[in-house]
Amino acid sequence: MRPSDVSFHMDVVSLTRQLVDIESISGNEAEIGNFLHAELSRLGYAAKKMVAESDRCNVFATLPNSSTPPVVFSTHMDTVPPFFASSEDATRVYGRGSCDAKGIIASQIVAAERLRTESIAVGLLFLVGEERDSLGAKVANHQSPGSKFLINGEPTENRIAVASKGALRVELTATGRMAHSAYPELGESAIDKLLEALARLRAMKLPTDEEVGPCTLNIGTIEGGRAPNVIPDKARAQLLYRLIGSSENLRAEIADAVSGLATADVTLEIPFTRLRTVNGMPTMIAAYTTDIPSLTNWGQPLLVGPGSIHVAHTEGEYVEKKELSEAVDLYCEIAKGLTA
């Protein structure tokens, strides 16, 4: 029997494991979306699917007679590869997505059910594609219910994020001229040009912020060349900058640094975001990006959730059971404060 063939386990640990055992690598979220839609409907929610692409659908659920909840809990259903099933020990739940972000889905559902017993209605928004391009969030942004606050879940160790760094993905392309490697003077090495361009970018002084920290650069991939005995005519690198403010100056500096060596094309930008905080709660800076910049029509954003980003996407991904339980309490506390 597949995990999606049975009903919700409303214990947060059991529900986390049940969700982890439904493989939902980005692009393959159909099964978990169908499961969440069916089970939330069974619990009495007015659940609907928002088609993002083909059979990939967001799930948005509200309580009957509460189609415009002031507070919406949200996170994503997709995970990075590879899939591995759930397991647990005395203190942790393991498995792909346990931390990022199926433990968060479980915590939000259990919190919503607890709030329901206290006559407090919140919405639930579960999205596809966050790990790839935030497609689900972009689609959802055109279908906002008019909520005032969006409590987005990502692994923050249950601390409120003061800000979330943005992202600037840049593709560098260098071109040269092929020649026999015995006669390099007859060609022009695209790889040499790319390496020089990368050296210049690495030497650039990047901005920093006293509260948020530094803008950072990761050279993620490098490829080029045809054979060891051929002067390469093309080389390419993919870079990712973590933004702490506007990208305008950085874009100009990148273009200037690589001028004459390579072209720099921006393939993705997610803006830096400052977030709403809650008095008295511990805070952190999210050095990663989230769906929040693509959900601008869903109200003032907050970012908080169980789990550590340092174990997300790893071969031993896990979430602490204690943090899952604490997250349920925390989501309830924040929602009550925002609706008081």
Language model regions located:
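Acidic/His- and Gly-rich active-site-bordering loop/insert found
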Residues: R2-G97, L303
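Short, conserved micro-motifs enriched in small and acidic residues
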Residues: Y94-A106, E131, E188-I191, K321, ...
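Short, surface-exposed alpha-helical segments at coil->helix boundaries
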Residues: A30-N34, I105, R251-A255
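Short glycine-aspartate micro-motif
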Residues: P70-V72, V93, K148-N152, R169-E171, ...
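Acidic/histidine-rich catalytic neighborhood of metal-dependent amide-processing enzymes
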Residues: K102, A106-R169, T173, D209-E210
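Metal-dependent amide/peptide-bond hydrolase catalytic core
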Residues: K49, P155, V162, R169-A340
